[in-house]
Amino acid sequence: FDPRFEEALLLLADGRAILAVGNEGAVYAEFAARGVEIVLCPSLSLMGQSRKLGHTVPDFLRSAGVVEGDRVGVVGWKSFEPEEWESSTPAIAAPAFLVDALREAVGSSNLVTDATRVLMDSTSGLRAVSGPDQLAAFEWAAARASACVERVTTSIRPGMTEHEAVAAMGYAGEPLSAHIMFASGPEVAIGLRSPTERTIELGDAVTTAVGFWGGLCARAGLLANGPEDLRAESEGYLERMAIPYWRAIATWYETMRIGVRGDEIQAAVEAALAGAFSPALNPGHLIHLDEWLDSPIRPESTETIASGMALQCDIIPDSTGPGWAANCEDTVAIADQALRRDLARIHPELWARISARRRFMEEQLGIVLADEVLPFSSAPARFSPFWLDPERALAYRS
């Protein structure tokens, strides 16, 4: 169950699971939620809707057994580092009206604390590692996302509008983890934006991304057949941007393994870039139903990669020249021998796809993977800098 249009509140205590929902969520929860008590709380509904039936938020908390003196942990959207917060009242990234009602119910602000890391911490969070069935769902999402992106990058032509280019992805209504992204021309640096009616031109920088629950794929490059189509401002793109970028992508994959520290991955990526540019954000992060869960990959991080993690290889350049763009983002999972055995036994078709992808990366791209690295994208690490020549991709020399 995921709330749509409204907030929802799941309360767990004394062996009970109680889900408070608004007017629209009440109908959806009956269909989508399992193993929980569903309670109507119309204050969670949109403005202007009826509040006549159901509970107020304080009434719901009382009926659920929240009383003065209770300690309550709240899982919000994210947690904060100690240096980010100066108040003695715990910082909680959840709707204020819910947090205020909880504090009133237990009689003290300090009895309501942030418990977000119980689920989302990059090493100890319950959602940081997944079992074989959840990983199988993520593999579907990642493979589907990469197929959508490939259809866009291989069918795009000068003269199309951005909307026409993105229509090639074949979106079929699946839940998204991020807005569908596409940008071209001088605004390509704003990779987060949605497609427009802009007409795409030969030599444009182009970028696109598609993400479903559990997997995202992104690619960026130039709308050209090769260097001969480049504008003056794009001179040197291949040597100074595309090749160092892909070298960092390949290094990320070859460094990834169980037990490697986050700062080791960060350092390896920065060394591979050799000063050409730096990662704008963490060069990789955990992914789940949400596109970014947390990241163990950052400077000075002693957190280690563990079996069961689903990760994005996500290196965003911190600077680009005019008309330049490079991106090659895909999803992988990390699995020890026992988890690999379970995946192969329970999901043999998935395992066959993973095995084929590993062979492709090693035999065609020259990237050597640890046994525990399982590519989920249909074209892992395949980076074609010139979109009008999709058959040509960067690889290590054999």
Language model: regions and residue ranges:
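Active-site neighborhoods and metal-handling regions in enzymes and metal-associated proteins
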Residues: 1-398
